Amino acid sequence: MSDPVLYGLARSVYTRIARLALEEKGVRYTLEEVEIFGSAGVPAEHLARQPFGRIPAFAHEGFTLYETDAITRYIDEAFPGTRLQPQELRARARMNQVIAIIDSYAYRPMIWGVFAARIVAPEEGIASNEMLVAESLTRSRTCCRALEEILGTNCYFAGAEVTLADLHALPILLYFSMTQEGHETLSAHPRLRAWLDAAAARPSVQRTRAKFELAR
């Protein structure tokens, strides 16, 4: 069996979500870096595998796939190792709920609204849009309240074990926590902060650290 190939960027949160699934399952894989944010735009060869120009994309023994949620579920079901999707109905529904919250409500404000303004923009000499930051923080705080309520007293979002929900949420919340506003927001939600600290210590997370974390 040939090793799967993941096309993306190590610094991309969605690429990292897929990498975390591969790491948690103990799957050998190749990460092929595809720069989609450069001045040249999305490479033509990547558009051939992902017509919307997003990352990641995935290939395994002639089977190609894009959309992170589809990729991580395939990884969990195609390879042996620890199950990352609960079998119990309500736990699985909770996992799906958290993934949807991250995609629909958390990703854009936390990453493009706050993280990009506070971490990426200064490195590139770009002024931050403070109105966008303020609006994004309001939305991010709502997400944190909702996620902490879902977490409750559990160790992980769907119960006692790590699932795809945790892997989906972690890269976004980790980047958000690197900003002052994100740190303060998470400090106001101690159960969510404790979840993030514990999840961030997992070997899979340490093995996939990106340049923004390594620089700090």
Question: Where are each of the predicted segments found?
Answer:
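A local structural micro-motif
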Residues: T30, G159, R207-T208
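GST-like domain detector, emphasizing the conserved glutathione-binding G-site
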Residues: M1-A134, C155
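GST-like fold's C-terminal all-alpha helical module
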Residues: S104-A201
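Terminal-tail/helix-coil boundary detector
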Residues: T208-R216
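Positions that flank functional sites
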Residues: I36-F37, V162, L214-A215
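Active-site-flanking alpha-helical
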Residues: A18, D76, I172-L173, R209
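Residue-level recognition of oxygen-bearing side chains
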Residues: A70, R90, R191, S204, ...
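Phosphate-coordinating loops and pocket residues in cytosolic domains that bind phosphorylated ligands
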Residues: A48, A201, A210
